[in-house]
């Protein structure tokens, strides 16, 4: 019934298994990949006919995690998976980016790649397994895909690279880098690093490329046994129409691309396009070329004109040379009520970035396959259509916005202070108000400035720059701070973010083969120079975090209490902590480790709550005098609340220097008194004394009373701590009666 084909290999100390022929057999291609005990199913289905009227590849990638893969039931009311999580969106993009350039030019059939996580061992992240499985399924499917690709994760531990580190090892690594590519070339890099050098980052890319070669070879072996017949598809021949368009448009396109203002340039290019369509597709008479072909060829002509001009003259669309960064204006404190804000403008790209500080209650609760956890740093990127002078859909963030936000998040996170030093939840929102290339890197720069404006003590400021590449044969040009047009028409989009000490994030998307290690090395070095320049421009606005938090930001005080005292602070049914919150107005969060975070915009409220909690958990010191209140009177003494919530007994013999016949003759309930803490007996009962304290001045009278007894020739009395707590013995009987009983009368 099943024609199962398998390939197995040991990869990174674990077994990788690729299997086809048993599951999802009606798909054009399907592969079940297992790495360790993490298993994913990848399927590929392509439409039978091309979609009409489009000039792009209609590829959709959906990565989905199932809760059962980790033996869990989804949360929420419906108890089933809903809209894609952030991770699912990011991994979908991670799969899409390296495979998209490998489809044969002109393929217009709907193509859908669906990757489902079936099992997760909580050690091997499914993203790498998903990329490998998707590559294998595409290779088997028969669609015109010039793969396969391989993918690997690279860590950097103890000064060495680690292939496919476990989830626990990633937490200890100074690098988390994912690289994908073919046998000959790197196509995609996504990474987060803790201020590593350019050489270490490039070494990691090449290490990953080298070590995923066995995976590519295994996919090829599987394809030799199980691949379907290639689709009957002939790439369209456009040489004649491209030549015709270039003949009509080249001169005017060169002039149009000399306009440095984006909107003027776009208008001029649109005018040339309309002229070309009118010339080659006349309304009357025979049309040699269809309007769709002419428009597609016009895009190619645009690319050639821009690329030739850069390679021939070294001059770019806006007149800059290849290394110059656009003019930068940095401003901070631009919003009066925000905790921190900045307006970062680089040429025609502008980001309004706002930082907000919150408490532990504001942390994001994330329900992932690995379990639930909280995230204290959030970065949200918004790209409204007005930023490019257009109308468009508004609503929930799309994949691009989520991806760009995560890139900026990765760039900033390594320089944030640890939670124990800065116990705030941090949210950064980047509103892209203008865009002409590199808006995600503008978000990094603006985010760094807004955080420092809010008083967040970053280790160092970070900046980001987007690099591009034009490659024609042996000639190439690396471009610093690319425009949107240079991004679309170039061969590489290469984003680098970091501090003056090193790289914190690197993202690379390469559209063609032939980009060598040497070219990448040049690009990284040029990016380092550009990043240093941008950091210098940012320093004109702010060089480090402000010494104080923003005026409207909450203040948080952190204290550590013994874990066995947590229940005392919370109280029965939360009674004590609710009382503290209600009476002080502060927010209080207690962690299982005994860390207590007290938050309020009012410093007095924080101090009151802090002192209250301290009084509950602290232990009184023997011999110290405290203010107290009589809370209960008994025949044998009075109970005094003297140290926060602590009560102790003043025995009747410790109420006054003279003999006391009745407790109520000396003190009343509610009376304010001064007491000396004598200690606690072996049962933990607290003993206090009033008679050794001057109730007016609070002076300790112990030595004075001893001296008076010595003058009277009285023997020094023993400490009552040796006698234990005698308070429950009841009232004394008359001494005369006791003598009579003992004599037998």
Swiss-Prot record:
<dbReference type="InterPro" id="IPR015847">
    <property type="entry name" value="ExoRNase_PH_dom2"/>
</dbReference>
<dbReference type="GO" id="GO:0006402">
    <property type="term" value="P:mRNA catabolic process"/>
</dbReference>
<dbReference type="GO" id="GO:0004654">
    <property type="term" value="F:polyribonucleotide nucleotidyltransferase activity"/>
</dbReference>
<feature type="compositionally biased region" description="Basic and acidic residues">
    <location>
        <begin position="701"/>
        <end position="745"/>
    </location>
</feature>
<dbReference type="InterPro" id="IPR012340">
    <property type="entry name" value="NA-bd_OB-fold"/>
</dbReference>
<feature type="domain" description="KH">
    <location>
        <begin position="554"/>
        <end position="613"/>
    </location>
</feature>
<dbReference type="InterPro" id="IPR012162">
    <property type="entry name" value="PNPase"/>
</dbReference>
<feature type="domain" description="S1 motif">
    <location>
        <begin position="623"/>
        <end position="691"/>
    </location>
</feature>
<dbReference type="GO" id="GO:0000175">
    <property type="term" value="F:3'-5'-RNA exonuclease activity"/>
</dbReference>
<keyword id="KW-0479">Metal-binding</keyword>
<comment type="similarity">
    <text>Belongs to the polyribonucleotide nucleotidyltransferase family.</text>
</comment>
<dbReference type="GO" id="GO:0003723">
    <property type="term" value="F:RNA binding"/>
</dbReference>
<dbReference type="InterPro" id="IPR004087">
    <property type="entry name" value="KH_dom"/>
</dbReference>
<dbReference type="InterPro" id="IPR001247">
    <property type="entry name" value="ExoRNase_PH_dom1"/>
</dbReference>
<comment type="function">
    <text>Involved in mRNA degradation. Catalyzes the phosphorolysis of single-stranded polyribonucleotides processively in the 3'- to 5'-direction.</text>
</comment>
<dbReference type="Pfam" id="PF00013">
    <property type="entry name" value="KH_1"/>
</dbReference>
<dbReference type="Pfam" id="PF03725">
    <property type="entry name" value="RNase_PH_C"/>
</dbReference>
<feature type="region of interest" description="Disordered">
    <location>
        <begin position="695"/>
        <end position="745"/>
    </location>
</feature>
<dbReference type="InterPro" id="IPR036345">
    <property type="entry name" value="ExoRNase_PH_dom2_sf"/>
</dbReference>
<dbReference type="InterPro" id="IPR003029">
    <property type="entry name" value="S1_domain"/>
</dbReference>
<feature type="binding site">
    <location>
        <position position="493"/>
    </location>
    <ligand>
        <name>Mg(2+)</name>
    </ligand>
</feature>
<dbReference type="Pfam" id="PF03726">
    <property type="entry name" value="PNPase"/>
</dbReference>
<dbReference type="GO" id="GO:0000287">
    <property type="term" value="F:magnesium ion binding"/>
</dbReference>
<keyword id="KW-0808">Transferase</keyword>
<dbReference type="GO" id="GO:0005829">
    <property type="term" value="C:cytosol"/>
</dbReference>
<keyword id="KW-0963">Cytoplasm</keyword>
<dbReference type="Pfam" id="PF00575">
    <property type="entry name" value="S1"/>
</dbReference>
<dbReference type="InterPro" id="IPR020568">
    <property type="entry name" value="Ribosomal_Su5_D2-typ_SF"/>
</dbReference>
<keyword id="KW-0460">Magnesium</keyword>
<dbReference type="InterPro" id="IPR004088">
    <property type="entry name" value="KH_dom_type_1"/>
</dbReference>
<dbReference type="InterPro" id="IPR036612">
    <property type="entry name" value="KH_dom_type_1_sf"/>
</dbReference>
<dbReference type="InterPro" id="IPR015848">
    <property type="entry name" value="PNPase_PH_RNA-bd_bac/org-type"/>
</dbReference>
<dbReference type="GO" id="GO:0006396">
    <property type="term" value="P:RNA processing"/>
</dbReference>
<dbReference type="Pfam" id="PF01138">
    <property type="entry name" value="RNase_PH"/>
</dbReference>
<protein>
    <recommendedName>
        <fullName>Polyribonucleotide nucleotidyltransferase</fullName>
        <ecNumber>2.7.7.8</ecNumber>
    </recommendedName>
</protein>
<feature type="binding site">
    <location>
        <position position="487"/>
    </location>
    <ligand>
        <name>Mg(2+)</name>
    </ligand>
</feature>
<keyword id="KW-0694">RNA-binding</keyword>
<dbReference type="InterPro" id="IPR027408">
    <property type="entry name" value="PNPase/RNase_PH_dom_sf"/>
</dbReference>
<keyword id="KW-0548">Nucleotidyltransferase</keyword>
């Amino acid at each position: 019934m099943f024609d199962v084909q398998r390939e197995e290999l040991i990869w990174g100390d674990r077994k990788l298994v690729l299997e086809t022929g048993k599951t999802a057999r009606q798909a054009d291609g399907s592969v079940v990949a297992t790495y360790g005990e993490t298993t994913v199913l990848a399927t590929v289905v392509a439409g039978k006919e091309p979609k009409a009227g489009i000039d792009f590849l209609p590829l959709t990638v959906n990565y989905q995690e199932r809760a059962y893969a980790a033996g869990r039931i989804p949360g929420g009311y419906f108890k089933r998976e809903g809209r894609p999580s952030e991770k699912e969106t990011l991994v979908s993009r991670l799969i899409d980016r390296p495979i998209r350039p490998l489809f044969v030019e002109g393929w217009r059939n709907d193509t859908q790649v669906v990757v489902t996580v079936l099992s997760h061992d909580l050690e091997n992240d499914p993203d790498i397994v998903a990329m490998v499985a998707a590559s294998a399924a595409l290779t088997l499917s028969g669609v015109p895909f010039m793969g396969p690709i391989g993918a690997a994760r690279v860590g950097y531990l103890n000064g060495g690279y680690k292939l496919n580190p476990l989830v626990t090892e990633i937490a200890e690594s100074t690098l988390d880098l994912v690289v994908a590519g073919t046998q000959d070339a790197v196509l995609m890099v996504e990474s987060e690093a803790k201020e590593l050098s350019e050489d270490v980052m490039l070494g990691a890319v090449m290490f990953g490329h080298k070590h995923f070669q066995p995976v590519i070879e295994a996919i090829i072996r599987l394809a030799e046994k199980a691949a379907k017949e290639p689709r009957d598809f002939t790439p369209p021949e456009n040489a004649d129409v491209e030549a015709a368009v270039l003949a009509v448009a080249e001169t005017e396109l060169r002039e149009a691309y000399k306009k440095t203002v984006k909107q003027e340039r776009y208008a001029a290019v649109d005018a040339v396009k309309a002229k070309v369509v009118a010339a080659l597709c006349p309304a009357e008479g025979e049309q040699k070329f269809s309007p769709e072909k002419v428009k597609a060829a016009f895009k190619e002509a645009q690319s050639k004109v821009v690329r030739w001009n850069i390679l021939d003259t070294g001059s770019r669309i806006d007149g800059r040379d290849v290394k110059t960064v656009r003019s930068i204006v940095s401003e901070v404190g631009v919003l009066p009520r925000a905790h921190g804000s900045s307006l970062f403008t680089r040429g025609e790209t502008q980001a309004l970035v706002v930082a907000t500080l919150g408490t532990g209650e504001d942390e994001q609760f994330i329900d992932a396959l690995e379990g639930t956890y909280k995230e204290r740093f959030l970065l949200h990127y918004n790209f409204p259509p007005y930023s490019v002078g257009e109308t468009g859909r508004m609503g929930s963030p799309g994949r691009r916005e989520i991806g760009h936000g995560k890139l900026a998040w990765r760039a900033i996170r390594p320089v944030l202070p640890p939670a124990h030093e800065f116990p705030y939840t941090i949210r950064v929102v980047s509103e892209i108000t203008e865009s002409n290339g590199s808006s995600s890197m503008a978000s990094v720069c603006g985010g760094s400035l807004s955080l420092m404006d809010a008083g967040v003590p970053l280790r160092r400021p970070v900046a980001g720059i987007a690099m591009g590449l034009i490659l024609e044969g042996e000639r190439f040009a690396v471009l610093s701070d690319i425009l949107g047009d240079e991004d679309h028409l170039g061969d590489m989009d290469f984003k680098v973010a970091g501090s003056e000490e090193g790289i914190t994030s690197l993202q690379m998307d390469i559209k063609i083969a032939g980009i060598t290690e040497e070219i990448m090395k040049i690009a990284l070095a040029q990016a380092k120079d550009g990043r240093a320049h941008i950091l210098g421009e940012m320093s004109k606005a702010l060089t480090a975090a402000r010494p104080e938090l923003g005026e409207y930001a909450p203040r948080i005080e952190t204290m550590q209490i013994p874990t066995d005292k947590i229940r005392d602070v919370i109280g029965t049914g939360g009674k004590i902590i609710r009382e503290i919150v209600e009476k002080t107005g502060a927010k209080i969060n207690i962690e299982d480790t005994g860390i207590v975070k007290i938050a309020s915009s009012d410093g007095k409220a924080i101090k009151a709550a802090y002192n209250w909690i301290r009084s509950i958990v602290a232990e009184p010191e023997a011999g110290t005098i405290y203010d107290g209140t009589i809370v209960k009177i008994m025949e044998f003494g009075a109970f005094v609340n003297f140290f926060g919530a602590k009560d102790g007994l003043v025995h009747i013999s410790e109420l006054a220097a003279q003999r006391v016949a009745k407790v109520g003759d000396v003190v009343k309930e509610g009376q304010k008194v001064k007491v000396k803490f004598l200690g606690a007996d072996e049962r933990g009962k607290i003993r206090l004394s009033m008679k050794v304290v001057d109730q007016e001045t609070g002076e300790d009278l112990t030595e004075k009373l001893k001296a008076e007894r010595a003058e009277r020739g009285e023997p020094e009395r023993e400490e009552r701590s040796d006698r234990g707590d005698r308070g429950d013995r009841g009232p004394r009987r008359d001494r005369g009666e006791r003598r009579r009983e003992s004599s037998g009368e």
